[in-house]
């Protein structure tokens, strides 16, 4: 009997090794075609990468690891693992959301989602976003086809709108505008919207190439992807606040996890609070409330009915920043690049501050987010001074604030060096890795952390310099 099971085990191991050999053979042949290497050399490089950092032959081939120096391969591989972890978290979120909405148990929920994915090819994110758990299964295929068609139409309409805007600005024919946009896309990798907001129609090809774009930002993000242990935390405002509470310096809670009495006591010394959805971004869903002893219970009842999110004491910003733009808390975005496995700069540093910008509220909005009507100006890392005028998402440039009339270029951000030091200290204590955007507010007593963003975009670096026809990719090239 035991001999029978031992024989089955040996056969299973033999079959596994046989499958692995076939997969490696397939990867070797593919890499040979891509590189021109001979069989032995391709096999050797794949084997060495596997022994050094654990890359499978299929992963080596699929992700073209032959393009990267050996010292960089581990970093790239960790990025792949991190992206898989993000996908896993999205899947879990979708399952939990469907269970909550329907009352299904986990097994049935997974079964239903898998069936829909098999029928339609739907992503987990779309399954949750469009509430497919509430739609009869027999209607899923038609509904998702409609969604995809709508997206295709919206993309086409968006591109046509951009072409029309370029025609209006330049006087070109529609055919010429489309041709020039496509040419810029081929030469620089820019997106349609980047052609418009960065005014590529006014830039020669060399400057277009030097503009830091979405594709460049994505490349850095994939190279320095966040370590798995930080992904869950950074994707959830509650966990981020818990891990970095030392730097927040203000009371906060989760709206669905606190009693009325505790809520009232927590914010007893606050005059204003702000609510942010747990998975919100770009200022979406953010609301502010005045709070007092008289209305605290009423505010609690209102906020506790919102989707799960964090509630924080509203930050009273430094008076100089209020004088500049009083409608919102104007935050500093400090972008860092860090890696524990290899230096990110030629002088051996494992963490580097890439750039900083001041996000300025543009009107009456309570948020300063650039995508919510705000403006941005670049900060000199040495002096803390704004070295550009402010620009908004539409490419409008402001030498003075449109509401207060305050001059923007030359404004010195209070406590800027302390804000940079705070980011460095947070890194030293946590060893958080990746390409990150730290949002920091300045109070009368110094910097406080607002939030940390995964994969900061390119626009906060590039937009302030467009009016001067200067591309800023040069300051990020050392990380590419």
Please provide the spans of the model-predicted regions.
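Repeat-associated, polar segments at repeat-unit boundaries in modular proteins
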Residues: 6, 11, 15-26, 48-93, ...
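Charge-rich, solvent-exposed alpha-helical interaction surfaces
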Residues: 27-30, 41, 45-49, 76, ...
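Conserved N-proximal alpha/beta basic substrate-recognition cap immediately N-terminal to
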Residues: 150-266, 423
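C-terminal active-site "lid" helix and adjoining low-complexity regulatory extension at the edge
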Residues: 155, 396-424, 428-435, 442-480
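Active-site nucleotide/adenylate-binding loops and adjacent lid/helix of ATP-dependent enzymes
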Residues: 223-332, 337
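Protein kinase-like catalytic core scaffold
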Residues: 273, 352-354, 448-450
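Phosphate-binding site of ATP-dependent enzymes
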Residues: 294, 299-388
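Internal helical hairpin/lid segments
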Residues: 368-414
């Amino acid at each position: 009997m035991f001999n029978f099971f031992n024989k089955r085990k040996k056969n299973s191991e033999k079959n596994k090794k046989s499958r692995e050999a076939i997969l490696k053979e397939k990867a070797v042949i593919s890499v040979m075609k891509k590189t021109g290497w001979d069989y032995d050399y391709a096999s050797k490089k794949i084997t060495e990468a596997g022994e050094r950092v654990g890359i499978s032959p299929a992963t080596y081939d699929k992700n073209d690891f032959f393009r990267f120096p050996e010292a960089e391969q581990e970093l790239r591989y960790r990025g792949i693992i991190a992206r898989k972890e993000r996908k896993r978290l999205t899947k879990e979120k979708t399952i939990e959301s469907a269970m909550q909405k329907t009352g299904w148990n986990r097994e049935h929920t997974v079964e239903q989602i898998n069936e829909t994915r098999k029928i339609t090819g739907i992503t987990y994110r779309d399954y949750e976003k469009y509430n497919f758990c509430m739609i009869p299964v027999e209607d899923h295929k038609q509904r998702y086809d409609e969604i995809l068609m709508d997206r295709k139409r919206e993309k086409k309409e968006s591109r046509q709108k951009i072409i029309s805007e370029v025609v209006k600005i330049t006087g070109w024919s529609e055919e010429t505008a489309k041709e020039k946009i496509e040419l810029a896309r081929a030469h620089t990798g820019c997106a349609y919207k980047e052609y418009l907001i960065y005014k590529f129609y006014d830039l020669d090809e060399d400057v277009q190439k030097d503009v830091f774009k979405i594709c460049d930002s994505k490349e850095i993000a994939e190279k320095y992807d966040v370590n798995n242990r930080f992904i869950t935390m950074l994707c959830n405002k509650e966990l981020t606040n818990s891990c970095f509470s030392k730097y927040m310096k203000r009371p906060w809670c989760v709206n669905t996890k606190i009693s009325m009495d505790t809520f009232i006591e927590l914010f007893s010394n606050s005059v204003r609070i702000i609510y942010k959805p747990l998975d919100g971004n770009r200022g979406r869903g953010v609301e502010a409330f005045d709070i007092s002893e008289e209305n605290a219970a009423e505010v609690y009842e209102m906020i506790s009915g919102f989707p799960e999110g964090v509630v924080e004491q509203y930050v009273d910003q430094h008076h100089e920043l209020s004088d500049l733009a009083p409608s919102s808390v104007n935050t500093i975005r400090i972008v860092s690049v860090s890696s524990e496995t290899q230096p990110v700069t030629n002088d051996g540093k494992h963490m580097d501050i890439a750039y900083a910008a001041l996000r300025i509220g543009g009107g009456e909005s309570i948020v300063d987010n650039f995508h919510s009507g705000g403006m941005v100006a670049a900060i000199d890392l040495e002096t803390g001074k704004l070295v550009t005028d402010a620009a908004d998402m539409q490419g409008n440039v402001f030498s003075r604030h449109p509401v207060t009339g305050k001059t923007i270029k030359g404004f010195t951000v209070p406590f800027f060096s302390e804000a940079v030091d705070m980011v460095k200290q947070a890194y030293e204590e946590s060893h958080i890795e990746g390409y990150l955007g730290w949002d920091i507010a300045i109070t009368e007593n110094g910097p406080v952390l607002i939030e940390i963003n995964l994969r900061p975009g390119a626009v906060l670096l590039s937009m302030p310099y467009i009016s001067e026809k200067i591309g800023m990719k040069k300051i990020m090239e050392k990380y590419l």
